[in-house]
Amino acid sequence: AGEIKELDSDDAVDILSELSDEKKEKVISLIKDENITENIRELLNYDEDTAGGLMAKELISVNENWSVLKCLGEIRKQAKDITRVHSIYVLNKKEELIGRLSLKDLIISPSKKKIKQIYIPKVDYVNVNDSGEDVAKLMRKYDLEAIPVINDDRQLLGRITICLLYTSDAADDDTRV
């Protein structure tokens, strides 16, 4: 359980999905961090060949109403749990994905400026139920390193990175990114 909690959520689920239900529950029960166990349980519910089954929960998200200064502080906190930051996703008060944030724009903007004044409203995304093959095609088409995963209410659930697709069986060899 100690090693499992150190992994990204998608990697932990890949390992746990190989275990029997009984062993899986035993390992999960040994993890003391509720946030980690909640993420693992959520990911175990998705079919492994869907965007939900491919995604990792670790990502950076910010609120459109935050100032640049608050945003930088929150990003520092969130980034501690992420191996590699590909994108910064912008959410509204309903936790809906509304855009992405350029690191350059964030760095050069005055500290009191609001994120809603500098974010980029265009963002490609996939639905949690989209097939892994469709995700691979979209990422290849737009040359994306990462893509956010949303539910039917446009709420941000996770992200899929190019690395996840390379290591996944969800995309057929001929559609692999």
Say what each PLM segment does.
Residues 1-168:
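Hydrophobic packing positions in regular secondary-structure scaffolds
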